[in-house]
Regions:
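Active-site-proximal helix-loop-helix substrate-binding element of RNase H-like nuclease domains
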Residues: 152-176, 183, 322-448, 472, ...
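Noncatalytic, basic helical substrate-engagement surface that gates or grips nucleic-acid strands
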Residues: 1-129, 133-155, 159, 233-236, ...
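C-terminal polymerase-core module
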Residues: 472-479, 483-532, 702-750, 754-756, ...
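Function-dense linear segments that define catalytic or interfacial modules
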Residues: 360, 366, 378-407, 411, ...
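Conserved "right-hand" nucleotidyltransferase catalytic core of DNA-directed polymerases
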Residues: 230-338, 347-356, 413-593, 609, ...
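Conserved RNase H-like, two-metal-ion catalytic cores of nucleic-acid enzymes
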Residues: 3-4, 8-53, 69-70, 74-81, ...
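Non-catalytic nucleic-acid-binding/docking modules located in mid-to-C-terminal regions
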Residues: 50-53, 98, 121, 140-144, ...
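Conserved catalytic core of nucleic-acid polymerases
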Residues: 453, 565-566, 570-573, 648-781, ...
Length: 837
């Protein structure tokens, strides 16, 4: 029998610390529950075990604590945010049918060892899933450790351990006896490190072998002294580190076969945890109609034909197969392609829908605008809880306890649709978010549908040639690197790259990971001065990213009409910003010459021109307005260069005396203050000491006192309310502020400071998009809104409409709100995006 045993505590800790804190809309922490399930599902998919045991530590002391008071004494307690998730996770695993095992006085490691030994004796094979290398001592031909690392799960068999450590798996405990283990506070022999311990065990075979050969010349005098003086500690460490195989638990592998569990309870719990995609991965059905039908018999409704002259209110949603249906009372209508378009603009009809954007696509394709759509449940759910990972009608109905009124086999979620839209509308009204939905988000869905439909023309041949030149450049860079290092290697392998830089070239290593030397961008940036190879490696990475993500990615996304049709997502960013995918046009790089060249391949159609309008320093203007700081407001009102004016005020010098370096410093702090940067981050950005940066920060806050007061008030109000708001009333819950973890809490404070500003900027650009799109239609222009990127709008216009479009963009963007400081938009034109910007 193939048995999979999970080291529960090890893996749940890895899940908790490896995933940022996730919460439900009511503030329940879920990241560890989410991550553990993903680990388990991936293991099941990859290995198809016959039985699964999940082993947990108990809170009670073990025999190791009895033997040594210091055992694990240096470990901190479990974070409260994780502790709250543990009982929920264990209940979920029980509902899913998994057998869990623990024993007071014994550790999960001992349970792994006991089950592996018993299954091997029965002729089976065992997979031990853990993030703890202690379990490697259990590896043999029948037992494989699946070692979870930050990036992947490594199967560790005897050959892999021999290759990595130069010893057999059972000898790893001999190594630990000598070197100790800081994480478990196992002492070992003071002064004997891993390298020495490995060498001793490789030569003498075991701890006992080392002590039997203390007179051997291979043992240096100082090592001999340490070994002789600490023999009892070494033997104690051997006992502490040895995994036992005789824990008093059920050892029959058949005992751990997965049971039926309680699927309905699991589905309900997952719905409460807002883990909808995981519900599907477990093969559970959480549609409200299905759940209710399992508990009671609902009246079955047969779909009907929509009346030829529909009137009144209908609720619309989409089945998983893409078909649409409408609900009116206890009637369900399946909508075919002929009747749906006319319904979307029918006079005398009001449509509450779930996910308006696809419907706006249909309306626009048929010459309409979707005028009958008055409410979107998906957008309402997003406004109520922007932190959710997904928004699906059936899942939200279960989450909001919207009970189905009937069952309909042809539309499983139809029975609860009206109840769901009712509760979402009520809750949005209670939150004061209806105006945000009606005037911004719902009209914006129409605008985004139109932008997706229109697309953005590109010069495909130019992109191909650019790709060819990048490949040639990459090949040249690669040859330079090989010449500098002295041999060829796989540049995409962190291990081989680390060996080339730190072993072959002798560069000073900055930090190490579990897999070896760190070769991340930050590390390489710090090593630029040591070797020209580092500069080439960074350049290689930049060019590779351009080629694979943008050049090849854009060509794959090219439509038959020669245009890129990106998908714009309204319900992803917690700040309210729009994102895009397939491809992501908002990440087209502009900070490098090569990256900005990509914008040159986004072109206007023949006979057309691109008109580009970009807000100038919108977030700083919002900061000046929202804080009421007179000095900052005056700088904007006078039309001054805000960064130059800031530098002049901080250093008490005339603006004419502000150097480029001083302006750069002022710019860094102007933007850094909104993102909660402290002296350390600011100093790093500016290349100055922490002390200098701290002085700079204090001077800045003394110069603009209301900015500091506002930032502090943001945090206090957010802690009191549990959320922050934009000036438009968009809310973002911040459960991070209640965390006992300092880093998590600090992150929440940064979000409390930044979200009102960044979120308000997002709201402004959204509202401007709605106004610009409508104005182009009202003035019956052929010009079309193509793209929004951060604070920038791009319109494609016929030559004879360019001046009119420039005026429309400037007026609508600058007049969309009236604040204490003016918004300004800079407008440019060109045949390419690069020229227009």
């Amino acid at each position: 029998m193939k048995l999979l045993v999970l080291d529960g505590n090890s893996l749940v800790n890895r899940a908790y610390f490896g995933i940022k804190l996730l919460t439900t809309k009511d503030g329940r922490y879920t990241n560890a529950i989410f991550g553990f399930q993903n680990i388990l599902l991936n293991l099941l998919s990859a290995h198809h075990p016959d039985a699964v045991a999940i082993a947990w530590d108990e809170k009670a002391p073990t025999f190791r604590h009895t033997a040594y008071d210091g055992y694990k004494a240096t470990r901190h307690g479990m974070p409260q945010e994780l502790a709250e998730q543990m009982p929920v996770l264990k209940q979920l695993l029980t509902d899913l049918g998994f057998v869990q095992v623990s024993k007071p006085g014994w550790e999960a490691d001992d349970i792994l060892g006991t089950l592996a030994a018993a299954n091997e004796a029965a002729g089976g094979t065992t997979l031990l899933a853990t993030g703890d290398r202690d379990s490697l001592q259990l590896v043999d031909d029948a037992n494989t450790v699946l070692l979870a690392t930050n990036r992947e799960t490594l199967p560790m068999d005897p050959a892999a351990i021999q290759e990595k450590y130069g010893v057999a798996p059972p000898q790893l405990i001999e190594v630990k006896s000598l070197m100790g283990d800081a994480s478990d506070n196992i002492p070992g022999v003071p002064g004997i490190g891993e390298k020495t311990a490995l060498a001793l065990v490789q030569k003498f075979g075991s701890l006992q072998g080392v002590y039997e050969h203390l007179d051997d010349k291979a043992i240096k005098p100082k090592q001999r002294e340490k070994l002789e003086a600490n023999k009892e500690l070494a033997e104690l460490s051997h006992m502490l580190g040895t995994i036992r195989k005789d824990a008093p638990i059920e050892t029959a592998p058949e005992h751990y076969c997965r049971t039926a569990g309680d699927p309905a309870a699991a589905a309900q719990l997952l719905a409460e945890l807002e883990m909808h995609k995981l519900t599907a991965r477990w093969g559970l059905d959480e549609s409200p109609a299905a759940v209710a039908a399992s508990a009671e018999t609902l009246p079955e409704v047969q779909p009907d034909l929509l009346p030829l002259a529909p009137e009144g209110r209908y609720d619309l949603a989409q089945n998983k197969d893409g078909s649409w249906y409408a609900v009116q009372g206890d009637s369900v209508y399946l909508l075919d392609n002929d009747r749906l378009p006319s319904l979307l603009d029918a006079a005398g009809v009001q449509l509450r829908v779930f996910d308006a954007k696809p419907l706006y696509h249909i309306a626009l394709e048929h010459g309409g605008v979707g005028a009958a759509i008055v409410f979107d449940g998906k957008l309402a759910a997003y406004l109520l809880n922007p932190s959710a990972s997904d928004y699906q009608a059936g899942q939200l109905a279960a989450e909001y306890a919207a009970a189905p009124a009937f069952a309909c086999a042809a539309a499983p979620d139809a029975g609860a649709l009206s109840a769901l839209l009712d509760v979402l509308s009520t809750k949005l009204d209670e939150q004061g978010g209806h105006d945000l939905l009606a005037t911004m988000e719902l009209p914006l869905a129409r605008v985004l549908a139109d932008m997706e439909r229109i697309g953005f023309a590109v010069d495909a041949e130019g992109i191909r040639q650019f790709g060819d030149s990048l490949r040639a450049e990459l090949n040249g860079i690669l040859q330079n690197i090989y010449a500098e290092v002295g041999y060829e290697f796989n540049l995409n392998s962190p291990k081989q790259l680390g060996e080339a830089l730190f072993d072959k070239l002798g560069l000073p290593p900055r930090k190490k990971t579990a897999r070896g030397y760190s070769t991340d961008a930050e590390t390489l940036e710090s090593l630029r001065a040591y070797s020209p190879a580092v500069d080439d490696i960074l350049k290689y990475r930049t060019y590779s990213k351009l080629l694979s993500t943008y050049v090849e990615g854009l060509l794959k996304a090219l439509g038959p009409d020669g245009r890129i049709h990106s998908t714009f997502i309204q319900t992803e960013a917690r700040t309210g910003r729009i994102s895009s995918t397939e491809p992501n046009l908002q990440n087209i790089p502009i900070r490098t010459e090569l990256g900005s060249r990509l914008r040159g391949y986004f072109v206007a159609a023949p006979g057309e021109t691109l008109v580009d309008a970009d807000y100038s320093q919108i977030e700083l203007r919002i900061l000046a307005h929202i804080t009421g700081d007179e000095a900052m407001q005056q700088a904007f009102l006078s039309g001054a260069d805000i960064h130059r004016a800031t530098a002049a005020k901080i250093y008490h010098i005339p603006e004419s005396d502000v150097t480029h370096e001083l302006r750069t410093s002022a710019k860094a702090i102007n933007f850094g203050i909104m993102y909660g940067k402290g002296a350390f981050s600011l100093g790093k950005d500016l290349g100055i000491s922490v002390k200098e940066a701290d002085t700079f920060l204090k001077t800045y806050l003394n110069t603009f006192p209301k900015v500091d007061g506002y930032m502090q008030n943001c945090i206090e109000h957010a802690k009191e309310k549990g959320y922050v708001e934009t000036l438009f009333g968009r809310r973002r819950p911040l459960p991070e502020l209640a965390s006992s973890n300092f880093q998590v809490r600090s992150s929440g404070e940064r979000m409390a400071r930044n979200t009102p500003i960044q979120g308000t900027a997002a709201d402004i650009i959204k509202l401007a998009m709605v106004h610009v799109w409508q104005r182009l239609r009202d003035e019956k222009l052929q010009a079309r809104l193509l793209l929004q990127v951060h604070d920038e709008l791009i319109v494609e216009a016929p030559e004879d409409e360019v001046e009119q479009v420039k005026r429309i963009l400037k007026e609508e963007m600058e007049q969309v709100v009236s604040y204490s400081v003016p918004l300004t938009a800079e407008v440019g034109t060109g045949k390419t995006w690069l020229e227009a910007h």
